[in-house]
Amino acid sequence: MKRVVLFLLTNLAVMLVLSVSARILGVDRFLTSNGLDMGMLLVFAALIGFGGSFISLLMSKTMAKWSTGARVIERPANQDEAWLVDTVRQLSKKAGLQMPEVAIYDGAPNAFATGPSKSRSLVAVSTGLMQSMNKKEVGAVLAHEVAHIQNGDMVTLTLIQGVVNTFVIFLSRLAAYAVDSFLRRDDDESGSPGIGYWISSIAFEIMFGILASVVVMCFSRKREYRADAGAAALMGDRAPMIDALRALGGLEAGRLPKEMAASGIAGGGMMALFSSHPPLESRIAALESAS
């Protein structure tokens, strides 16, 4: 969950900065005396949208380390850290990947993988995860994160986010222009946008950005199933991944919880649309039914 949420928050912040900077520098040429130039607005939206998502991708590893306080293990300080590094090395070799950075941070049971490319990635594990699972289960979680890197999920997420950003910026400017036109006095023939346009464009950008995150989260949930399957393949057995999922939800074998909050796992209802992970029982069922 951390991987996706950090990316979304960074992306939103970068987009807002780029939008404000474009206004200050006067490069938002889509506003004319005759109204909006739709062609120029679309070009502007695409440049800011994809620019924001790719800048977020480049910043992803640095932001993840900073926000979690993760410490990259350069020289293992104990047997657990040595085991972590060795396990990630073995899994990466099986996946045909370069060795990613391995980090550890204090916190509740969780793990994530991030980075701008397969060759510049990071796998981070919380101390809570290490303390609450056995090594086979932790190994399955590590395999799941390595599978995310192998599948190129961060780059794919960036492309999807770029498309979503483009629509968010395009629609927010259209809505803001409509609001400004409604608020402008009939005797105002300057054609220049008023303060209502600039305030509402930022407000609409934030609102549409939050709503559009449903699309990104839907993609994330689908990739979780694929990462689960990838972990099972790397481990050579589905049982460790199933056991790890049960451990994340505080389960005993064969039992499923009514409510699941660990690691961004969603239950039902509207909030499930904003979850980066599918319901835990669905992930377990998918693994158990895999041929």
UniProtKB/Swiss-Prot annotation:
The active site is at residue 145. One of its GO terms (cellular component) is plasma membrane. Zn(2+) binds at residues 144, 148, 224. Keywords: Cell inner membrane, Cell membrane, Hydrolase, Membrane, Metal-binding, Metalloprotease, Protease, Transmembrane, Transmembrane helix, Zinc. Its EC number is 3.4.24.-. InterPro entries: HtpX_protease (IPR050083), Pept_M48_protease_HtpX (IPR022919), Peptidase_M48 (IPR001915). This is Protease HtpX homolog. Binds 1 zinc ion per subunit. HAMAP family: Pept_M48_protease_HtpX. NCBIfam families: PRK05457.1 (NF003965). It comes from Chlorobium limicola (strain DSM 245 / NBRC 103803 / 6330).
